[in-house]
Amino acid sequence: MILLISDLHLEQERPDITRAFLALLAGRARTAEALYILGDFFEAWIGDDAMSPFQRSICQALRELSDSGTRIFLMHGNRDFMLGKGFCKAAGCTLLSDPSVVQLNGEPVLLMHGDSLCTRDEGYMRMRRYLRHPLTLFILRHLPLSTRHKLARKLRNESRAQTRMKANDIVDVTPDEVPRIMQQFGVRTLVHGHTHRPAIHKLQIGDQSAKRIVLGDWDRQGWVLQVDEQGMNLGSFDFVPETVALLN
């Protein structure tokens, strides 16, 4: 069994999400071969040298899962692209490049966070290229912590405001970009997050059937894609104690 999740946006202000995630780690994830986290794991990340006690507790929980035998793979999102090797080493997880092709049930599957598919949002794509540039990352990592905190708050507030103002199709994936990148990597299955629009989309690429699985965000409920001998099942659960207990 392999589990895939994304867009938890973990932060101390949302203990309900944290409880649900920790229940997943202590339960179903313990029997999984691997856990893939496809970006926006944290609501914000300003550097491995600036871990808060809350973030350290999450790191320790991941380490315990890793030590139990479950492999953990972590991909950058647009909120936590500064996660680095230091965190991954401490958490016992492997940093996964975006995009990456992995074998799931013997089939090559393309994994992405999903923000790079939203090419119609030209302003965001420009900002993404700037923030992910190695020189920008070097500068950001060497800014004082207070400056990084202020910058992170500013970027989050601007992102939320701009998203509310943009048309729905602009902040969703570009339809033509999906088959293009799937053909580029030679896959018939794509799994991504970012858009907060969980669904399984069927599509046609040439003469072959294909599918795009969109993971949900953990805001009002949690979402997990489970891959096993039965196939790929995208499911959700509520953040109530009775439902969270079922994750065990």
UniProtKB/Swiss-Prot annotation:
Pathway: Glycolipid biosynthesis; lipid IV(A) biosynthesis; lipid IV(A) from (3R)-3-hydroxytetradecanoyl-[acyl-carrier-protein] and UDP-N-acetyl-alpha-D-glucosamine: step 4/6. The keyword Lipid biosynthesis applies. GO terms for cellular component: cytoplasm; extrinsic component of plasma membrane. One of its GO terms (molecular function) is manganese ion binding. GO terms for biological process: lipid A biosynthetic process. Binds 2 Mn(2+) ions per subunit in a binuclear metal center. Keywords: Cell inner membrane, Cell membrane, Hydrolase, Lipid A biosynthesis, Lipid biosynthesis, Lipid metabolism, Manganese, Membrane, Metal-binding. Substrate binds at N78, R79, D121, S159, T163, K166, H194. Mn(2+) 2 binds at D40, N78, H113, H194. It is a peripheral membrane protein. Mn(2+) 1 binds at D7, H9, D40, H196. Its main location: membrane. It is found in: Cell inner membrane. Pfam families: Metallophos (PF00149). Its cofactor is Mn(2+). Signal peptide: none annotated. Its EC number is 3.6.1.54. It catalyses: UDP-2-N,3-O-bis[(3R)-3-hydroxytetradecanoyl]-alpha-D-glucosamine + H2O = 2-N,3-O-bis[(3R)-3-hydroxytetradecanoyl]-alpha-D-glucosaminyl 1-phosphate + UMP + 2 H(+). It is an enzyme of class 3 (hydrolase). The keyword Nucleus does not apply. Hydrolyzes the pyrophosphate bond of UDP-2,3-diacylglucosamine to yield 2,3-diacylglucosamine 1-phosphate (lipid X) and UMP by catalyzing the attack of water at the alpha-P atom. Involved in the biosynthesis of lipid A, a phosphorylated glycolipid that anchors the lipopolysaccharide to the outer membrane of the cell. Belongs to the LpxH family. This is UDP-2,3-diacylglucosamine hydrolase. The gene is lpxH.
